[in-house]
Amino acid sequence: MAVASRLAVARVAPDGGAAGRRRRRGRPVVAVPTAGRGRGGAVAASPPTEEAVQMTEPLTKEDLVAYLVSGCKPKENWRIGTEHEKFGFEVDTLRPIKYDQIRDILNGLAERFDWDKIVEENNVIGLKQGKQSISLEPGGQFELSGAPLETLHQTCAEVNSHLYQVKAVGEEMGIGFLGIGFQPKWALSDIPIMPKGRYEIMRNYMPKVGSLGLDMMFRTCTVQVNLDFSSEQDMIRKFHTGLALQPIATAIFANSPFKEGKPNGYLSLRSHIWTDTDNNRSGMLPFVFDDSFGFERYVDYALDVPMYFVYRNKKYIDCTGMSFRDFMVGKLPQAPGELPTLNDWENHLTTIFPEVRLKRYLEMRGADGGPWRRLCALPAFWVGLLYDEESLQSISDMTSDWTNEEREMLRRKVPVTGLKTPFRDGYVRDLAEEILQLSKNGLERRGYKEVGFLREVDAVISSGVTPAERLLNLYETKWQRSVDPVFQELLY
């Protein structure tokens, strides 16, 4: 979804793989097993422990670069990490579920399916099981951050298992979950706020830097995939490809046409919202296409992105408007003399929200949330393009002469017109057909019989009708201009 604040293990994981590394909506979280699995065992307090922020030697810029470089790994160690978010609602009233209902679901999952609880100030705010976790977005959007897996079959099985578990617990409570990119019915004032102190900092800051940041926090859902790279050059090619093609993915997966009970004028309102959330930390990052781009250039960019907060002495310190560069030299007025740890750097990287994000892997962030088949299709689309050398080279060749102006045009227009967006002498649909074939070819060459996961994408492109346009058609015909039936149509 949006404010990326996923529950993350705040220490640097030794494998550095593309795990379902959480896009965090600005929240540093440590999950340190302290009790038995499931059955109400708590994983630990979610804020970073004091031990986690003890200083050894001051960080240098080289340390920050080395952190990103540590993500490089040989192809045989590449993994697929998939994340998705969904809206919980009361089946009888369609209203968004409140925190106490979410807490009961989390407790039910822990009790029945052997998850560890993640607790913050006596509130259960997430679950962890092995390398996968469940976390809450600011408005209670329910997120699965998947484990790093080898094949799309494993990824889809993980998604299906999660949806089965959530449905089993939720149905008994009269709660359903909706797979869509933007809350279709309820106003911002109707959305509950999760009991997480750090969100207050973001809620206060967002209106200062854009008009749609609160919508992003509370009313959007996404599906994304996190993928690995082998070297700086491999990272650069994948970053280029991901940014160039992100609007194409946005078109294919466009699924947020409603707002407060009626059409909103967009096929992907979720995507549009990111254009007026906080332009200091979002967008298409044109500097990535400069000849000088590499890990160090991304570090320079991130150093100047305004911070949200620092966690010290069991408190979140509001550092909005200050840069990590200030932090590096102990010049945060709100925390005088404090110097950052790698923990702080990792958490800062998760508060940057471009269409493709670099951490120790690359995150493809352009797709709306959707029903379960599309949760499997999104990672399949990108794996076929980025994990196959031949397809990656073909895409690099295809997009190498696209200008920054053309990429920005696609970013701006696709949320409105989807596959029908003009591009050069054709339309985005024409591009999508060619790109889909390259993705299929890439999956074929992987040899895991994964091409079937692209059926949903194939159906959208061959018909030329995005998921959002299909919903709009139902709204005008069968649903008799009511959005209420979407809660059943896109129910998990």
Swiss-Prot record:
It catalyses: L-cysteine + L-glutamate + ATP = gamma-L-glutamyl-L-cysteine + ADP + phosphate + H(+). It is found in: Plastid, Chloroplast. Pathway: Sulfur metabolism; glutathione biosynthesis; glutathione from L-cysteine and L-glutamate: step 1/2. GO terms for biological process: glutathione biosynthetic process. Its EC number is 6.3.2.2. It is an enzyme of class 6 (ligase). Disulfide bonds join 156-376. The Cys-156-Cys-376 disulfide bridge is known to modulate the enzyme activity according to the redox status. The oxidized form constitutes the active enzyme. It comes from the Eukaryota. Keywords: ATP-binding, Chloroplast, Disulfide bond, Glutathione biosynthesis, Ligase, Nucleotide-binding, Plastid, Transit peptide. Belongs to the carboxylate-amine ligase family. Glutamate--cysteine ligase type 2 subfamily. Homodimer or monomer when oxidized or reduced, respectively. This is Glutamate--cysteine ligase A, chloroplastic. It comes from Oryza sativa subsp. indica (Rice).
